[in-house]
Design a protein with these regions (language model features):
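Conserved, mostly hydrophobic/aromatic
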Residues: 109
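Phosphate-group recognition and catalysis centered on beta-loop-alpha active-site segments
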Residues: 112
């Protein structure tokens, strides 16, 4: 994760005056001509450009930017995040809030890296898999609540504000996520609480339904760090 050139991104000024004075580097017209992209369409025809991160901290580090200039805000976009995770199960999709590490808070974007690179992911996967195999909740996970097929846990092995969400469907994951976000403290001058979010899709072995083999069964997993 050593990339000295990343200081241009991580130390970028993100105050209102600085953002207005610079050209947005995520807008298509301001990107280098050699930077190509793939397209991804989210819900309600929201379109994204999938880009190689020019200042990576991971191998195969991606930026998934809206194809229009719109502020960084997770509202109404959680299902886009889960769809990205399901379509690309070998990646973890992550979101930095506008005041929580996003170097372009004026242009909405997710990021992605190969799943399993972060120790937190591996430990949470291990604990969830253990819980599902044994039927018992590990010490690291404290059950909080459920919404439909989605479950919320507090993760106790890191800082205090780490929550784990699991769900079988994108819709229930989004419902539970927004209920959790509604409980977080928020400053009056901010558009959303301060948090970072990881999301990935855990594929399950193919199952037979009405005699037909389906490989679509799996589980959405997310981690919110507040």
């Amino acid at each position: 994760q050593h990339n000295p050139a990343r200081i241009r991104s991580s130390a970028a000024k993100v105050d209102k005056a600085s953002l207005q004075a610079r050209k947005c580097f995520l807008c298509a017209e301001n990107r280098p001509p050699e930077q190509r992209h793939l397209e991804f369409e989210g819900r309600k025809e929201r379109k994204y450009d999938v880009l190689i991160n020019p200042y990576p901290i991971f191998p195969n580090h991606l930026v998934i930017a809206r194809n229009i200039h719109t502020p960084q805000s997770i509202w109404h976009r959680m299902t886009d995040m889960t769809d990205l995770a399901r379509h690309h199960p070998s990646f973890t999709i992550f979101y930095n809030g506008p005041k929580c590490g996003a170097s372009a808070p004026d242009h909405f974007h997710f990021q992605a890296c190969p799943h399993g690179l972060m120790p937190l992911e591996a430990d949470i996967d291990k604990n969830i898999d253990l819980m599902q195999a044994s039927g018992e909740t590990p010490e690291a996970l404290d059950y909080v609540t459920s919404v439909q097929d989605a479950n919320l846990y507090h993760y106790g092995k890191f800082t205090r504000g780490v929550f784990v969400l699991t769900a079988r469907t994108s819709k229930s994951m989004a419902k539970l996520f927004y209920r959790l976000v509604d409980c977080l403290p928020q400053r009056e001058d901010e558009t959303e609480p301060m948090f970072n979010l990881l999301c990935w899709y855990r594929k399950s072995p193919s199952q037979k339904l009405l005699g037909i083999s389906h490989g679509r069964f799996g589980e959405y997993r997310a981690v919110l760090l507040a």
